[in-house]
C-alpha cells in the first residue's frame, strides 16, 4: 500500500531539530528550490542558504512550517534527512540580531571595497548577508517562488 508521507529528520551538530512525518519538503539546493516527498528517487544534494518548507502529514494544502536553514545536505532514501550547520523556525528568529549581523557585514564590505572576492573575509561577509536576507524573509512568513 502506497503512503503519502515520509519521515523527515533535520539534524544540526548540536541537536535533532525536527523529526516527523511529512507530505512534502522544499529546500534550496545548489541547483535551486527542489521538493521531495514519499517515493522520491534516491538523492543526495548540497543545500545552499535558504528556506526550508515542511508540509506535515495531514496538514491543509496551504499549511506549512517554514524555517531558515544554513548550508548542508539532504539525503533522500526511504526517509529524508537534512544535515545543516544551523536552522531556526520563523517564530524563533531574533530580528534585532539579524539586522545587527547584516549591518556589520555591510559595514565590512563598505570598508573593504577592494577585498579579494575569494578571500575568506569576503566570503564570510557575503554568507552573513545571505543568511540575514533568508532569516528576514522567513520571519516575514517565507517567500517561496
Where are these regions (language model features)?
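Short, charged, intrinsically disordered terminal tails
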Residues: 1-5, 143-145
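Compact, glycine-rich, soluble single-domain proteins
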Residues: 7-9, 13-100, 104
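Acidic/glycine-rich phosphate/pyrophosphate-binding loops and surrounding catalytic core
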Residues: 87-145
Amino acid at each position: 500500500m502506497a503512503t503519502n508521507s515520509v519521515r523527515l529528520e533535520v539534524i544540526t551538530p548540536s541537536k535533532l531539530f525536527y523529526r516527523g512525518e511529512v507530505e512534502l519538503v522544499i529546500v534550496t539546493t545548489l541547483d535551486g528550490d527542489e521538493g521531495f516527498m514519499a517515493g522520491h528517487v534516491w538523492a543526495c544534494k548540497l543545500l545552499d542558504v535558504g528556506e526550508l518548507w515542511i508540509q506535515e502529514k495531514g496538514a491543509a494544502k496551504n499549511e506549512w512550517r517554514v524555517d531558515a536553514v544554513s548550508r548542508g545536505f539532504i539525503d533522500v532514501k526511504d526517509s529524508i534527512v537534512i544535515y545543516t550547520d544551523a536552522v531556526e523556525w520563523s517564530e524563533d528568529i531574533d530580528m534585532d540580531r539579524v539586522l545587527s549581523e547584516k549591518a556589520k557585514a555591510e559595514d565590512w564590505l563598505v570598508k573593504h571595497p577592494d577585498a579579494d572576492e575569494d578571500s575568506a573575509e569576503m566570503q564570510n561577509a557575503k554568507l552573513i548577508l545571505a543568511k540575514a536576507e533568508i532569516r528576514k524573509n522567513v520571519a516575514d512568513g517565507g517567500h517561496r517562488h
